[in-house]
């Protein structure tokens, strides 16, 4: 069957989900029937067609009254502020992809369900009372038909969780630290301006800016045994896309750097193919733009100190990789629910 999807919020992730759907050739499996976005339809069409990070969209895009047309497909455009007013029942929506970055509670998910959607997938970490949080490639097989309100976690969680799992399964992780080196985001300023976080009052293009992160909590959500044994910090850097994560873990078993690389390379070619990639090329962040993997391990940067301290550098396109995982998780939810 074809999964009927509605998108709530047509920002960076919402637009990339649509682009990824068309570029990946999965339109026979997923069809977008509606997009709810407060911005005007002309702006939506323009930003879908022209993207500073990902270039010009190959499909024809045009606006026709209350529709956004992509090729021969017509997608209904809505401008509803209230979740309760959304016509999901009328449109026969199977899964809502909530890409607002604002909603993430069970209450918000239930509002989509009350409006007629069968399932909801949030594009960001949700509250602890959601039915499931999925990192595709790691735990999507735990989805059940009764799981109606699900989170796809975050781009950084999707990037680092597969690598942590591989290292823990092989060597037994005792503790770890993570530093996220993240491209600038929409909640930063173009020039100095007011913000509740005083560091984010500063111009995004001129500084490396430390910000708060809940990545450690995201890690322990998947690995409860690491509670109080993982810490994370994050900085934003003056680039517009692609993120690097510096992961350091102490492990129980002694290991060498080449053994770590071999483990991760084999995983990229085997069980985690399509989710994790591995490279030893002398690449920089822009080279990972538009990469669909959740994580790309940079084998040139792997280090081991004292046989028990492993340091790795993992890249991801925090937009494109995550948008592709949104599609993967949508299909996984539909498979268990509607088969």
Swiss-Prot record:
The residues that the entry says bind NAD(+) are: 12-13, 81, 318
Key word Amino-acid biosynthesis present: no
One CC-aspect GO term:
cytoplasm
Q: Which domain of life is it from?
A: Bacteria
Q: Name the catalysed reactions.
A: D-erythrose 4-phosphate + NAD(+) + H2O = 4-phospho-D-erythronate + NADH + 2 H(+)
The EC number(s) this enzyme carries: 1.2.1.72
Give the keywords, sorted. Answer: Cytoplasm, NAD, Oxidoreductase, Pyridoxine biosynthesis
GO MF annotation terms: erythrose-4-phosphate dehydrogenase activity; NAD binding
User: Which stretches are annotated as coiled coil?
Assistant: none
Give me the disulphide-bonded residues.
Answer: none
Q: Where in the cell is it found?
A: Cytoplasm
Say where the protein is mainly found: cytoplasm
Site (Activates thiol group during catalysis) residue list: 182
Residues the record marks as active site: 155
Q: Which pathway does UniProt place it in?
A: Cofactor biosynthesis; pyridoxine 5'-phosphate biosynthesis; pyridoxine 5'-phosphate from D-erythrose 4-phosphate: step 1/5
Q: What does this protein do?
A: Catalyzes the NAD-dependent conversion of D-erythrose 4-phosphate to 4-phosphoerythronate.
Record's subunit section: Homotetramer.
The protein here is known as D-erythrose-4-phosphate dehydrogenase
Q: Which organism is it from?
A: Escherichia fergusonii (strain ATCC 35469 / DSM 13698 / CCUG 18766 / IAM 14443 / JCM 21226 / LMG 7866 / NBRC 102419 / NCTC 12128 / CDC 0568-73)
